[in-house]
């Protein structure tokens, strides 16, 4: 039987699974939506002998599979024992964003009940917690546009045409709003002087030249960047060697508007290379 590369797309309803499935389908994956997990081993056998057989398969699994979720560990073990390469992409978003998306689309939550959408989301998190713990990648779509999410998924799976380079996301965030899920490296830059307490700089962000000059001009910041760049010079090739295709570097300060933004922007361009695709995201820069 032909061995498949299998990507299981799972996660919270409204977190971007449909966008991810469409992106993989456009990249040549054979995509199946809402396949009961218990049928996965048999499906892979049938697919291997079919006229549409290909080596790349993606399956969307979520709470619509509720009756079949309990045996996921046994099913995954069976699939892997057959020689298939399995990655689990878990899509998530903060509750406030999920609630807003449901309000905007007016769609019914799969676990919809009289207690409301918030309670349905809570129950969904509980049901999918075990699968999340086993996931290969956790993708937080809270602050990503559909286009950004699609690009991220494609980079994770395919890299680009230059020998599948390492796709790096450098993102800033505010500890006030929580550490981004799916972060591989997290750096806390709250040890640096805060532009928030400089009246002229407070209304600006780390994207402005004044704030960037203030933050990057600090001796402590220059030393930090020098040490961190040396660490990345060691880590990035090591991640590539181990077969990692996507790396998320998260830089945090108190509110995610000044220090972390300035440093993330600097790093985004400092670590550019022919064997990497580097993108940037400022999760909390627009928040007050």
UniProtKB/Swiss-Prot annotation:
<dbReference type="InterPro" id="IPR053930">
    <property type="entry name" value="RapZ-like_N"/>
</dbReference>
<keyword id="KW-0342">GTP-binding</keyword>
<keyword id="KW-0067">ATP-binding</keyword>
<dbReference type="GO" id="GO:0005524">
    <property type="term" value="F:ATP binding"/>
</dbReference>
<protein>
    <recommendedName>
        <fullName>Nucleotide-binding protein Pcar_1935</fullName>
    </recommendedName>
</protein>
<dbReference type="InterPro" id="IPR053931">
    <property type="entry name" value="RapZ_C"/>
</dbReference>
<comment type="function">
    <text>Displays ATPase and GTPase activities.</text>
</comment>
<dbReference type="InterPro" id="IPR027417">
    <property type="entry name" value="P-loop_NTPase"/>
</dbReference>
<feature type="binding site">
    <location>
        <begin position="11"/>
        <end position="18"/>
    </location>
    <ligand>
        <name>ATP</name>
    </ligand>
</feature>
<dbReference type="GO" id="GO:0005525">
    <property type="term" value="F:GTP binding"/>
</dbReference>
<dbReference type="Pfam" id="PF03668">
    <property type="entry name" value="RapZ-like_N"/>
</dbReference>
<keyword id="KW-0547">Nucleotide-binding</keyword>
<dbReference type="InterPro" id="IPR005337">
    <property type="entry name" value="RapZ-like"/>
</dbReference>
<dbReference type="Pfam" id="PF22740">
    <property type="entry name" value="PapZ_C"/>
</dbReference>
<comment type="similarity">
    <text>Belongs to the RapZ-like family.</text>
</comment>
<feature type="binding site">
    <location>
        <begin position="62"/>
        <end position="65"/>
    </location>
    <ligand>
        <name>GTP</name>
    </ligand>
</feature>
